[in-house]
Each structure stands twice: as C-alpha cells, then as structure tokens.
C-alpha cells in the first residue's frame, strides 16, 4: 500500500530518479524551457518549485544546498543573479507545464516545462520568424508587381 507516498516512481531506482530530476532542473534553469514527457515534467515542476522557493533565502547555506543538487556552477550563478531577481516577488508558481500531444515513436504524452516569466524568449523567436515571413512575402509581392509593370510596358510597345 502506498499510504502517504508522494511523487511518481518514473520506473527508476531512487538514485536514478534523483539524477534525472537534477538533470532536468539544470536544463530548465539553463535554457528556461525544456521538452520532456508529461510525467517527468510534472515531477520536475515540484522539484524546481521547491528549489526556487528555498533559493529565495539567498544565504550561503542555501547556495551550498543548491550546489549539491545542480552541479553546473554557471547555472547556479544564473539562478541567484538573474532568475531570482526576476521571479523573486512571486509567491509560487514559477513554472508551467504545457501539454503538447503524443511522441511519434512510442506515443508517450509530451509536454513543455518552462519558467513563467521567461516565455518572452519564445515569443521573441516567434516575432522574428513572423517578421522574416512578412519580409519574404513583401519581396515576393514587389517582384510580382515589377513583372506586371514590365508586361504592361511590353504590351504598350506593341
């Protein structure tokens, strides 16, 4: 019986699960957005939320505790210098899980796990892509207009 046992097993041993969660946390804090299975995303979300809440104290002991979980010094520096000031006022809910659908190979439900205030990175990329597309469409329209003008000139000459 699983009385008062929280969390998902994820079909792994305890050490493998903790290594997985540490790795997912490091990737999330480094890239601000990761794509993984729904179960891993939901489990990593609770882990990251607790870690960020703990890191908000911002003292030496907490930094050492975070370093024991995240083995990349650059990511830890980024957490304390960039991420915490941006989401420090928030009382919780630092991450969101966006469901994507099934993975092609094994139909596993996929999801995106992202930091809440950092989705502007994705929006910026989408805007750049849209601007590029608009420029291409405008260039194509200009080219078409030139062809029509040339055709009109040829007809007038005849």
List each language-model region with its residue ranges.
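Structured, basic alpha/beta domains of bacterial-type, RNA-associated proteins
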Residues: 1-153
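Primary mode marks residue(s) on the alpha4-beta5-alpha5 output face of response regulator receiver
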Residues: 157-158
């Amino acid at each position: 019986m699983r009385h008062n046992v929280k969390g998902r097993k994820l079909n792994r041993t305890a050490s493998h699960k903790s290594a997985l969660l540490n790795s997912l946390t490091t990737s999330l804090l480094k890239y601000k957005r990761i794509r993984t299975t729904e179960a891993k995303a939901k489990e990593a979300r609770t882990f990251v939320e607790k870690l960020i809440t703990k890191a908000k104290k911002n003292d030496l002991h907490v930094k050492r505790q975070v370093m024991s979980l995240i083995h990349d010094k650059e990511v830890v520096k980024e957490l304390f210098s960039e991420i915490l000031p941006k989401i420090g006022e928030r009382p919780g809910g630092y991450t969101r899980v966006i469901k994507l659908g099934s993975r092609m190979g094994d139909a596993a439900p996929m999801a995106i796990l992202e930091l809440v205030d950092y989705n502007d990175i994705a929006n910026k990329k989408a805007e750049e892509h849209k601007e590029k597309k608009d420029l291409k469409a405008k260039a194509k329209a200009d080219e078409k207009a030139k062809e029509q003008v040339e055709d009109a000139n040829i007809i007038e000459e005849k």
